[in-house]
Amino acid sequence: MFSFFTYFLLSALLLSASCRQPSMDTSKADRILREIEMETELENQLSRARRVPAGEVRACGRRLLLFVWSTCGEPCTPQEDMDIATVCCTTQCTPSYIKQACCPEK
């Protein structure tokens, strides 16, 4: 009788302890789910560029390449060592500046 009672008491203690402490797999899964939720919340937020209207639009990288192609119809062949990438990325370039720098014959 005493051993049955001891066995029952130890089983009850182990059961209650395991209910209070999540297993390692559960805590990892919960952590991963929280990280995924945080990432999706960050993705759904609007970027600053879309939240705040900008006064001027600057062309850098791919945007500059597309701007040159739409203005000249061909890749840029710079005149007199003009660095249009630096100029257009720091200030707003006009189509006339792009034509003068890249394709003056057009």
UniProtKB/Swiss-Prot annotation:
One Pfam family linked to the record: Ins_beta
Gene Ontology molecular-function annotations: hormone activity
Residue positions assigned to the propeptide: 20-51
Subcellular location(s) of the protein: Secreted
Signal sequence, renumbered to the chain: 1-19
Family membership noted in the UniProt record: Belongs to the insulin family.
UniProt protein name: Probable insulin-like peptide beta-type 1
Organism: Caenorhabditis elegans
Lineage: Eukaryota, Metazoa, Ecdysozoa, Nematoda, Chromadorea
Gene: ins-4
